[in-house]
Curated annotation (Swiss-Prot):
Membrane-related topology note: Peripheral membrane protein
Binding-site residues, ATP: 170-177
Compartments where located: Plastid, Chloroplast thylakoid membrane
Species this protein is from: Arabis hirsuta (Hairy rock-cress)
EC number(s) stated in the UniProt entry for this protein: 7.1.2.2
Function description: Produces ATP from ADP in the presence of a proton gradient across the membrane. The alpha chain is a regulatory subunit.
Chief site of localization: plastid
Protein name: ATP synthase subunit alpha, chloroplastic
Keyword Transcription in record: no
Gene name as annotated: atpA
InterPro entries, alphabetized: ATP_synth_asu-like_sf, ATP_synth_asu_C, ATP_synth_asu_C_sf, ATP_synth_F1_a_nt-bd_dom, ATP_synth_F1_asu, ATPase_a/bsu_AS, ATPase_F1/V1/A1_a/bsu_N, ATPase_F1/V1/A1_a/bsu_N_sf
CDD domains according to UniProt: ATP-synt_F1_alpha_C, ATP-synt_F1_alpha_N, F1-ATPase_alpha_CD
Pfam families reported in the protein's UniProt record: ATP-synt_ab (PF00006), ATP-synt_ab_C (PF00306), ATP-synt_ab_N (PF02874)
Length: 507
């Protein structure tokens, strides 16, 4: 017969009582009233915060954007096809954040920082809020270091500095993405981390950009954040903030970063779609009233940090698409007023074979020569002036047939200067090569050549100077100034190559 031992039973009961946990977990829940078009209306969720993440029963995550008196408007970060009316939703108590680490370099990710390049998971120990406040006035210092794009027209006349925000604006198919990708290629060896954010583009276009960066070894220092045209509007809206959070991670670690948003018109359209579906009142061009804040809070995160914070920088190149050159539309005017200048690409110039199709007359950099080395300042001033005079004369010359010799010479010089600004895609030039090219043009060495010979001569001149006059490049890179010694090396090289070239052409 089994004996019952009372002491053993009482010990077991005591242990169980000690193990009993009286903690009460409070979950803020709600019920789905309606779902569709990437939007869900939730009843309940009484204590939810604006921008808080909520989780649906079947695993979809959403963001609470509209807090109304009797329901909460949630935008879905997925298709939400499995969400049913009446199913439960719980608030997570978290704001959207992403993991960040050095391991993201060379990878293609989506707006939630998940890899989409098929190369496995990315390890990360830290995380950052997708929307974090921009550095304040005390945390910044003025922009003073150049960020070279490798394009003569930009680096000489519309210079960009580290920590600046420069808008690239133009119609579709005018080479906006090409300017941005060339700038990434030119950062090779410059210790600059690049982030390319593709918003609402064709997957084939993004693949093309990634391939061209891989072929030239630029993916080593680049992160691509891509949300293609078939992505939900919520993710297209979040993608630029994800890119900014990744760039900020490196900026606060005393590194220099460059971020390209391609393009913000698509982000504004995604935000407009979300806002209209949430029944927010539409404003101009049916955009919601806070579309300016959408872009200003993103672009204000670009900064040149003060010496106390390590002097890191984040340079932003937002891209905006115009409709038949209309820069006075809502989104273009908004972004122009937020940024520190704009590079205007013209369809007419592009079709006339002037590529990059930069309209130098209406492009501007509000940082200006503070973002140039001294040697570039020395040669660029003359180029700007001569091109401006040429543009004026060219318009005047259309109405007059008999021009005096001086005017004809000025027109001829202007045409050759315009020729030297032309560059092939994915062929950025070093700052030394740019200086020698501009010097050759502004000092009349190209005047004796036919327009068709200019580019051929310049290519040969760069090679000749590199091999026969390496002292010129050494002086520029060490002193950052066009000294009298450097100028004499340059003059000798140009004269020697010009004689060789003219002999060659005669044969």
């Amino acid at each position: 017969m089994v004996t019952i031992r009372a002491d053993e039973i009482s010990n077991i009961i005591r242990e169980r009582i000690e193990q009993y946990n009286r903690e009460v977990t409070i979950v803020n829940t709600g019920t789905v009233l309606q779902v569709g078009d990437g939007i869900a209306r939730i009843y309940g969720l009484d204590e939810v915060m604006a921008g808080e993440l909520v989780e649906f029963e079947e695993g979809t995550i959403g963001i609470a954007l509209n807090l109304e008196s009797n329901n909460v408007g949630v935008v879905l970060m997925g298709d939400g096809l499995m969400i049913q009316e009446g199913s439960s939703v719980k608030a997570t108590g978290k704001i959207a954040q992403i993991p960040v680490s050095e391991a993201y370099l060379g990878r293609v990710i989506n707006a939630l920082a998940n890899p989409i390049d098929g190369r496995g998971k990315i390890s990360a120990s830290e995380s950052r809020l997708i929307e974090s406040p921009a550095p304040g006035i005390i945390s910044r210092r003025s922009v003073y270091e150049p960020l070279q794009t490798g394009l003569i027209a930009i680096d000489s006349m519309i210079p960009i500095g580290r920590g600046q925000r420069e808008l690239i604006i133009g119609d579709r198919q005018t080479g906006k993405t090409a300017v941005a990708t060339d700038t990434i290629l030119n950062q090779q060896g410059q210790n600059v981390i690049c982030v390319y954010v593709a918003i609402g583009q064709k997957a084939s276009s993004v693949a093309q950009v990634v391939t061209s960066l891989q072929e030239r070894g630029a993916m080593e220092y680049t992160i691509v954040v891509a949300e293609t045209a078939d992505s939900p509007a919520t993710l297209q809206y979040l993608a630029p903030y994800t890119g900014a959070a990744l760039a900020e991670y490196f900026m606060y670690r005393e590194q220099h970063t460059l971020i390209i948003y391609d393009d913000l018109s698509k982000q504004a359209q995604a935000y407009r779609q979300m806002s209209l579906l949430l029944r927010r009142p539409p404003g101009r061009e049916a955009y919601p009233g806070d579309v300016f804040y959408l872009h200003s809070r993103l672009l204000e995160r670009a900064a040149k940090l003060s010496s106390q914070l390590g002097e890191g920088s984040m340079t932003a190149l937002p891209i905006v698409e115009t409709q038949s050159g209309d820069v006075s539309a809502y989104i273009p005017t908004n972004v122009i007023s937020i940024t520190d200048g704009q590079i205007f690409l013209s369809a007419d110039l592009f079709n006339a074979g002037i590529r990059p199709a930069i309209n130098v007359g209406i492009s501007v950099s509000r940082v200006g020569s503070a973002a140039q080395i001294k040697a570039m300042k020395q040669v660029a001033g003359k180029l700007k002036l001569e091109l401006a005079q040429f543009a004026e004369l060219e318009a005047f010359a259309q109405f007059s047939s008999d021009l005096d010799k001086a005017t004809q010479n000025q027109l001829a010089r202007g045409q050759r200067l315009r020729e030297l600004l032309k560059q092939s895609q994915s062929a950025p030039l070093t700052v030394e090569e740019q200086i020698m090219t501009i010097y050759t043009g502004t000092n009349g060495y190209l005047d004796g050549l036919e327009i068709g010979q200019v580019r051929k001569f310049l290519v040969q001149l760069r090679t000749y100077l590199k091999t026969n006059k390496p002292q010129f490049q050494e002086i520029i890179s060490s002193t950052k100034t066009l000294t009298a010694e450097a100028e004499s090396f340059l003059k000798e090289g140009i004269q020697e190559q010009l004689e060789r070239f003219l002999l060659q052409e005669k044969l």
